[in-house]
């Protein structure tokens, strides 16, 4: 497995941050936080840049709230500036991770997703009238961060990038 370096400078590059802002606001232009950020976009992108290059990087706390759809769930979201950071990171890391995935990995990938996964599952299952719908309880909360970080270290050797 080839390890990738010198990613941090690409992530914090101003043009990448601007692209990240455009992606993060897509479909959310009516939100007050997006409008406020966009009013002073250059200044706010500089603040994000400064937060990212600080060691350790300055991150905001998650905002949590409950929804009932159809059962009670706790939702965690980050403030809009951190969302821009996430997009900046993924703009650079997505191609790195795409090379690691097997073809039939469907979640959160361009041109894939739940509909493509369902089509493939139906194709494999033939004409079966039965299916299994499941929800892994507290899946993201149960991910072992030590194991995840070890996996990331095998792919990424840029220490500054790993701090993010």
Question: What do the PLM-derived regions correspond to, one by one?
Answer:
Residues 27-36, 60-87, 100-112, 132-133:
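Short, conserved non-catalytic motifs in the polymerase core
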Residues 16, 48-71, 84, 91, ...:
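Reverse-transcriptase-like RNA-dependent polymerase core
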Residues 44, 51-52, 70, 103-104, ...:
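Conserved polymerase palm-domain catalytic core
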């Amino acid at each position: 497995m080839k390890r990738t370096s010198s990613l941090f400078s690409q992530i914090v590059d101003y043009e990448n941050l601007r692209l990240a802002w455009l992606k993060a606001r897509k479909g959310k232009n009516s939100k007050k936080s997006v409008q406020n950020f966009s009013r002073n976009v250059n200044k706010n992108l500089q603040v994000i840049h400064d937060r990212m290059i600080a060691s350790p990087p300055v991150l905001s706390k998650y905002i949590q709230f409950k929804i009932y759809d159809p059962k009670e769930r706790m939702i965690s979201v980050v403030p809009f500036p951190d969302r821009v950071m996430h997009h900046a990171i993924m703009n650079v890391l997505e191609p790195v991770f795409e090379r690691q995935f097997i073809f039939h990995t469907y979640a959160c990938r361009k041109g894939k997703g739940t509909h493509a996964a369902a089509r493939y599952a139906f194709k494999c299952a033939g004409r079966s009238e039965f299916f299994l719908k499941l929800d892994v309880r507290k899946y993201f909360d149960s991910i072992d961060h030590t194991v995840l970080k070890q996996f990331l270290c095998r792919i990424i050797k840029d220490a500054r990038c790993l701090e993010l």
